[in-house]
Amino acid sequence: MDLSNLKAAEGSVHSDNFRRGRGHGSGNGKTAGKGHKGQKARSGAPRPGFEGGQMPLYRRLPKRGFKNRNTLTIVPINLSALERFDNDAVVSVETLIEAGIVKNPRDGVKILGNGELTKKLTVQANAFSASAKEKIEALGGKAEVI
């Protein structure tokens, strides 16, 4: 060890910010680098969204609508998507979730008549279009509203 590779002991060197406001000799006494008076010299910060007394944006804009948390989201499913089920199968919301057609178990299901159906199925859904119901029943299946 010599004078060219001296190092301070670990933990002994601190940032100057730890010693603010500790007398004139420090160069950061009295106002501790905050300047004189005024909003920025005070403790605490204004709350988010405060615009210095000007009418804030969230009060200048009109209130408009809301999102109803109890609304049932209806997922439309075409008859062509039901082709993957076996003949005489019962197609319910649970089986549609297992097949990956419906993602959220809280969603409702409406069966639409787009595409062709070639299998006899018992389909349980929240709603059916007229053409879908007609096509399901034409093959001897059932369209049950749950």
UniProtKB/Swiss-Prot annotation:
Organism: Agathobacter rectalis (strain ATCC 33656 / DSM 3377 / JCM 17463 / KCTC 5835 / VPI 0990)
Protein's job: Binds to the 23S rRNA.
Record PROSITE patterns: RIBOSOMAL_L15 (PS00475)
GO cellular component, one term: cytosolic large ribosomal subunit
Region annotated Disordered, chain positions: 1-57
Record protein name field: Large ribosomal subunit protein uL15
Gene Ontology BP term (one): translation
Pfam families found in the cross-reference section: Ribosomal_L27A
Assembly mode: Part of the 50S ribosomal subunit.
HAMAP family listed in its UniProt record: Ribosomal_uL15
Similarity comment: family membership: Belongs to the universal ribosomal protein uL15 family.
